[in-house]
Amino acid sequence: MEIKGKNGADMEFCLPKVYPFPPKSLYIEHEKDGQFLREMLMRLLSSTPLVQLEVILVDALSLGGIFNLVRRILDKDNDFIYQQKILTESEEIKEALKYLYEYLKVNLQEKLAGFKDFAHYNEIKEDPLPLKALFLSGVDALSSDALYYLEKNHAFWL
């Protein structure tokens, strides 16, 4: 991109790729998906009050290696991270996806009637619903039960 300066001098600079944030739903397949997940996680943590946030971290392939940067946060007993750990085992991943599905199902049926979405509800109501964010790496390694709940959750994100 070229910009004309005040004195007529041309300046050239690059802009990074920009993703809308927070996205309603974001799914990406890329060889650097771990880096992308880390960047989005850091962006979320720096832009959202932690008392209004719950993050579910799933690394089904590398035993939590994708989220190594979060390990220091996990040591601090931060309750905004689901179970205060990076989920790597099939059963705990399935339970987390089931938990997220139940949360979405209950809130969509009970609290969000008459509202456009969670953001619209939180703008109007005094008891805002926390933002739930799922960071998932290794979809191919998920069990069939976990995939079932992932598909159920995905239906809410569309």
What are these regions (language model features)?
Residues 1-158:
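P-loop NTPase catalytic phosphate-binding loop
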